[in-house]
Structure formats: C-alpha cells, structure tokens
From Swiss-Prot:
Keyword Calcium: no
InterPro entries, A to Z: DIOX_N, IPNS-like_FE2OG_OXY, IPNS-like_sf, Iron_ascorbate_oxido_reductase, Oxoglu/Fe-dep_dioxygenase_dom
Family classification: Belongs to the iron/ascorbate-dependent oxidoreductase family.
Gene3D superfamilies, per the entry: B-lactam Antibiotic, Isopenicillin N Synthase, Chain
Binding site for 2-oxoglutarate: R253
CC cofactor: Fe(2+)
Lineage: Eukaryota, Viridiplantae, Streptophyta, Embryophyta, Tracheophyta
Top-rank EC class of the record's enzyme: oxidoreductase
Protein name (database record): Probable 2-oxoglutarate-dependent dioxygenase AOP1
Disulfide bond positions: none
Entry's cofactor comment: Binds 1 Fe(2+) ion per subunit.
Organism listed in the record: Arabidopsis thaliana (Mouse-ear cress)
Key words, A-Z: Dioxygenase, Iron, Metal-binding, Oxidoreductase
EC number(s) per entry: 1.14.11.-
Amino acid sequence: PSVSFQLPVIDFSDQNLKPGSSKWDEVTADVLKALEDYGCFEASFDKLSVELNRSVFEAMEDLFELPIPTKQRNVSSKLFHGYLCHNLYESLGINDANVLEKVNDFTQQLWPDHGNKSISETIHLFSEQLVELDLMVRRMIMESFGIEKYIDEHLNSTYYLTRLMKYTSPPDDDDDEETKLGLRSHTDKNIITILHQYQVDGLEVKTKDDKWIKVKPSQDSVLVMVGDSLCALLNGRLHSPYHRVIMTGKKTRYSTGLFSIPKTGVIIDSPEELVDKEHPRIFKPFEYTDFLHFFQTEAGR
C-alpha cells in the first residue's frame, strides 16, 4: 500500500537565483537536504507557464493519436530512445529537444511532408526551460560536494532526451494489480530526471525505509530525481529512488520527462575528492551504454 505524502517543494522562480548569491546558497542547502532524504524533490518553476503546459498537453494528445505505424517511425540508434509501447505505457523520444533543429527532425519523422512547426516549437521551448532547471540543480549538487572545479566538464559531458509518455487506464473488468502497473518499479539509469505529470496522478516513489509514497506535484511544478549515474559519480553520496506508475480510475495519464544522459564514450568515475577511508570507492568506472546493456542482461536485473 502507498500513502499520500508531500515531498519537499523548492522554488526556483526567484530572479536573484544566481550562483554566488545568498538566495542561491539557501536553495542549494534545501536541494541537498531533499536529495539526501528522498533522492528527489518537487521544484516550482514559473518558466512553465499555464499556456506552455497546455500547449505541451495538446501536442501530446495530437502525437499519440497518430497511427502506430507512424509513431514507429520515431526511431533512434540509441537504446530505449525512440518509440516504445508496453501494456498501458506508450512513449515517444526526442534527442536534444533543447535544439530546435532536432525537434524538427523528430516531427519530420512523423510528418515527412511538412513536419509540424507548432508542435516543434512547443516541445523545444518546454525542453529549453527544463534544461535550465537541470543545469541549476546539477551545479548546486556539485558545489555541495566540493567538486565545483569539475562543473563545466560535467555539464559538457551530457546530452538530453525528452520523452513524452501516455498511460492508458486499465480495462474496467480487470482487478489484477499487475495490470494497473503503468510502469514497474525501477530506478533511472541517467544523471538527473525531471518529470511533469498532467492532470492525472499515478507516480509513486519509494522512501529509504521502503514505503511507497504517492507523489502529487501541483500543475506548475515538476519532480526532480537523482539517477544511478549521478549516484555513481558522487560515490554513493546520494541515492536514486525507486519509482513506479500505478493507474487507477478511468483517465488517460500524460507525462513528460527530461533526462540528462552521459554522452557516448564518457567514463563515469567518482572524483578523488569524494573517495577516502570513510567513503571507499563503491563503483568501478563505467561507460553509460555498457551500463544500460548490462541491465538488459539477466545479471543486471
């Protein structure tokens, strides 16, 4: 069973939120505490206006209404990056959606004749705003652990995947708990994930003491979550929380995710500043694609 619970809410809307300011230090302390306690927090961020959220929601409705063969043209050479469909879950993926040209490539896959200018612009603007939040959070985390000298190198070592997700409600006559699982319990493998859900709740996060909590962010806020690669980079100083999606009721659930992901060839290794007698090295250095492939094998499950 899960319980409703309010995760820490941290406001990133202040105009004075610049590195080095007292406001920055205050928010950084809140971010660190929330991530140490839960591995995630709710961020309120006024750049996600009501209009922008509505445009993204409408874009998702239009995209998912396309025929399956059309959606299957959303392909990528990267593992798990294109169109995915499993039970109640369906998803489209756009690499580097903070670059307008890349979003145009995505809409061109689905509408080869003319793309879709308004959907491209909406997804690009939305991704751009979330990237800004991702960069702030990662800078704060690195400052908190005294490894700010690696900030630029770290921020340049990643790229972004924007994922649009649709969860269909389970059939009426189905009481099987398993089928209500929109997405099974998992940790994210990347650096940071920023999730936004539209109108229908369903996301649950596991706490350190193994309790499932229902996460109900307000419409103008997002959930910021630590991924396994960040946990490894920080030598286990933060943890990546298990989370899942439970579908109850009759409404279709839409959500978006922005994932910061290590670029191909980047080796994830804890800086020596985070390794000492009390904190011996926990993870062998690894390359992200190898890590993903490992989780695809029996040993990794």
